Amino acid sequence: MGRVDPVSVVVDDGVGWSAWPAPAKLNLFLQITGRRVDGYHELQTVFRLLDWGDTIHLRVREDGQIHRIGESVTGVVEADDLVVRAAYLLKYATNVHLGADIFVEKRIPVGGGFGGGSSDAATVLLVLNALWHTRLDVAVLAALGLRLGADVPVFVHGCNAWAEGVGECLTPMILPGAAYLLLDPGVCVPTRELFLDPDLTRDASPATIGDFIAGTAFGNAFEPVLRRRESAVAGALDVLSEVGFARVTGSGSGCFVEFSTRDEAECALERLPYGLCAWVADGASRSPLLDVLKTMEF
C-alpha cells in the first residue's frame, strides 16, 4: 500500500516575485442536455473547489513584456500557454504599460479534468489585475476568462457553483465540508474526441439544484465513454469503487471518491494498491486565492 503524489516543481522566489494559489476543482455531477446551433454543448454540472492545486509565481516587469519562465509541463509553446494568453488578454483589455514574468509550480495533473490550466489562467487574471492596478471588476474578468475557456469563470468568481450553458452560467452553492481521494490514471483523452463519440449521451433531461441536493442528479456523462475507450480509466474507477462511490471529474481522466472527513479519505488512500498516483485534498468553501487577495494591500 502507498501513494505517489503528483510531481511538484519549485521556483526560488527572489526579489519582486510573489506566489499565488491556483486551486483545482472537481465536477461532482456532469450531464449534457443538448447542443447549440454554434456546435457547443449545453451542460449542467456542479463545480467543487479544492484547497489543493498549483502555485503561480509572478513578477511585474516595467518594460511591458510578458514571459513564461521555465518550460511548459505540456510542451505548449509560450504564446499558446493559457497563463501567457491570460496576461496578454488583460494587458490589451486595459492598455496597461506593465508586463510580467510567470512561473507555474505545477501539481495538478495535465489533462485530468481537475481544471489546472483554467485555474492557472484565472489566477493570472485576478492577481495581475491587482498588481497592475487595472481594477477591473470580477464580472469583467470572468468575461475575459471565458474567452480562454469555459471553466475559467468559476475560478475567477472563486466559489462552488451549479453551472449551465457551456459551463459559464454560474449559481453559487454552499456545499458541505468533505475530503476527496483523487486518482490520476495518467492518460489524456482530448475532450473534442469525447464529444464526438457516438456513445456519448447528449440529450439528458435537465436537472435542478434541488435534484442534485436530493441525490437524484449524479454521475458524469463522460464516464461510460471513458470506461470503454481507456482501460486505465476503467481500472482506476474499479480500484476506487472498492473504497467508495467512484466518479470521473470533467471529461476525465481524473477520478475521485468523496468522504465526510479527511481521516476517512486518508484511510481509504492507504487501502489502495502501491504505486498509484493518488492523494487526498479537502473541499474548499471558496477559492483560497480570494482569501489571500483580501489580505493584501495594493
Curated annotation (Swiss-Prot):
Source species, domain of life: Bacteria
Catalytic residues as annotated in Swiss-Prot or TrEMBL: K25, D151
Keywords, comma-separated and alphabetical: ATP-binding, Isoprene biosynthesis, Kinase, Nucleotide-binding, Transferase
Binding site for ATP: P109, V110, G111, G112, G113, F114, G115, G116, G117, S118, S119
Record SUPFAM superfamilies: GHMP Kinase, C-terminal domain, Ribosomal protein S5 domain 2-like
MF-aspect GO terms: 4-(cytidine 5'-diphospho)-2-C-methyl-D-erythritol kinase activity; ATP binding
Alphabetized Gene3D superfamilies for the sequence: 3.30.230.10, GHMP kinase, C-terminal domain
Catalytic activity as recorded in UniProt: 4-CDP-2-C-methyl-D-erythritol + ATP = 4-CDP-2-C-methyl-D-erythritol 2-phosphate + ADP + H(+)
Pathway of action: Isoprenoid biosynthesis; isopentenyl diphosphate biosynthesis via DXP pathway; isopentenyl diphosphate from 1-deoxy-D-xylulose 5-phosphate: step 3/6
EC number(s) on file: 2.7.1.148
Coiled-coil regions, chain positions: none
GO biological process: isopentenyl diphosphate biosynthetic process, methylerythritol 4-phosphate pathway; terpenoid biosynthetic process
PANTHER family assigned to the protein according to its UniProt record, in alphabetical order: 4-DIPHOSPHOCYTIDYL-2-C-METHYL-D-ERYTHRITOL KINASE, CHLOROPLASTIC
Function: Catalyzes the phosphorylation of the position 2 hydroxy group of 4-diphosphocytidyl-2C-methyl-D-erythritol.
Family membership: Belongs to the GHMP kinase family. IspE subfamily.
Name of the molecule in the record: 4-diphosphocytidyl-2-C-methyl-D-erythritol kinase
Species of the source: Xylella fastidiosa (strain 9a5c)
UniProt lineage: Bacteria, Pseudomonadati, Pseudomonadota, Gammaproteobacteria, Lysobacterales
